[in-house]
């Protein structure tokens, strides 16, 4: 259930951005996923499917897997920044942390992030990250 909610939230965030995109333009999206795992794979695939449905033929996806190594996340997202991608999707906390450190200009969507405040070292986190970062959490509502 958490997996489905995360995928749906990522799709909603994406679809909110669609009206501001120029028709006929191609966008490059870098996807950095920490490790191969069923839940992370499903979140990434749901994101890619939503992008391709919303912008058929307009999105080039560059998908990279860090093989469980946070140093690889940094290398991957720094490559995305150097390549000038239009959006970074960071799947898992180390990927988000690396992306946040790599750029304050390129929009970043995080998914499968348990605690944004902890991931981004924000002591005064109120539920909104601000800046160039947004996304979904995999933290279960315990109420």
Annotate the PLM regions.
Residues 46-54, 98-102:
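Alpha-helical structural signal in soluble globular domains
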Residues 27-48, 62-73:
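Extracytoplasmic "Venus flytrap"
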Residues 57-59, 106, 131:
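A structural micro-motif
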Residues 116-143:
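Hydrophobic alpha-helical segments within soluble ligand-binding/sensing domains
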Residues 26-30, 107, 132-135:
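Residues that mark the start of a beta-strand
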């Amino acid at each position: 259930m958490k997996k489905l909610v995360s995928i749906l939230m990522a799709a909603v965030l994406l679809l909110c951005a669609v009206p501001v995109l120029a028709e006929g333009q191609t966008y490059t999206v870098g996807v950095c996923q920490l490790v191969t795992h069923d839940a992370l794979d499903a979140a990434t695939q749901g994101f890619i499917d939503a992008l391709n449905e919303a912008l058929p033929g307009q999105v080039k996806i560059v998908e990279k897997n860090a093989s469980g190594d946070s140093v690889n996340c940094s290398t991957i997202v720094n490559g995305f920044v150097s390549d000038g991608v239009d959006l970074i999707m960071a799947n898992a906390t180390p990927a988000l942390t690396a992306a946040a450190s790599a750029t304050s200009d390129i929009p970043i969507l995080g998914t499968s992030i348990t605690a944004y405040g902890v991931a981004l070292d924000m002591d005064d986190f109120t539920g909104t990250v601000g800046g160039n970062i947004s996304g979904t959490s995999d933290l279960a509502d315990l109420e």
